A protein has these predicted regions:
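Long, distal/terminal scaffolding or interaction modules
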Residues: 1-239
Length: 239
């Protein structure tokens, strides 16, 4: 189904999505917020730029955006996939606890903030370009991958990555010699076991966006995890 949303507010747009089943293509999207919030079993393609909180509370749908997206993509996402053929704004994956977000380009500040795993759910976010400051802030679970493709000399992450990180894992396609991590996390070169896990995420990314998986994986990766011997203590209540 083709849905022209020019001039439509987000409430009317979401109501139209709920009333229709099957594959839906949204045309002339221009900043409408909360698209597909909390929706299940939808396949949505968006032509245009969606506003903040795209796919918030998503619970099993697939969203493809053929452009950039704004802030808080996948906020508190539970299940499903969000695929962005462009860049995303700040706070992508805020508190997501399941599902996958794939971004062809760059991410703004605070990507993966408060990301967490829930029971058998493990959220995954793959950023093809670079990520801004405070990547993985307060990360409690899940996986963040940053590939730094076409970065043209730019650092793969901004300032203060992993601040407050106390769970989960991060893969960075770089030796990270110019990245300053907090003392409460451990950054080390990826080993064979790490690369086996990483291959799953990178393969899916490359299939979506047309990159060569072997070429991407040929570069060195750094794995970042919380340091159990030196955890953040002042930010959290002890169990």
């Amino acid at each position: 189904m083709l849905l022209n949303v020019k001039g439509l507010d987000y409430k009317a747009l979401n109501e139209a999505l709920r009333q229709n089943s099957g594959d839906i293509t949204i045309e002339n999207c221009c900043g409408q917020r909360f698209i597909a919030a909390g929706m299940t079993d939808k396949n949505i393609t968006i032509n245009g730029v969606p506003g903040n909180a795209l796919g918030a509370y998503l619970n099993g749908s697939t969203i493809i955006v053929n452009a950039n997206a704004q802030d808080a993509v996948g906020d508190t996402m539970n299940e499903g996939e969000i695929i962005i053929h462009g860049n995303i704004g700040d706070a992508a994956g805020y508190a997501m606890r399941g599902g996958k977000i794939f971004v062809k380009g760059n991410a703004g500040y605070r990507a993966g903030i408060h990301m967490k795993a829930y029971k058998e759910k493990v959220p995954v976010m793959v950023i093809g370009g670079t990520a801004g400051s405070f990547l993985g802030e307060y990360q409690a679970g899940g996986v963040i991958v940053v590939l730094g493709l076409e970065a043209t000399g730019k650092k793969i992450v901004g300032f203060f990555p992993c601040t407050g990180m106390h769970g989960g894992k991060m893969f960075l396609r770089s030796e990270c010699k110019d990245v300053k991590f907090p003392s409460q996390v451990t950054a080390r070169p990826a080993d064979e076991s790490d690369m086996k896990e990483l291959k799953t995420y990178v393969t899916e990314y490359c299939d979506l966006f047309g990159y060569d998986m072997n070429e991407v994986l040929a570069s060195p990766f750094t794995v970042v995890t919380p340091d159990s011997k030196n955890p953040y203590k002042q930010m959290y209540v002890a169990n």
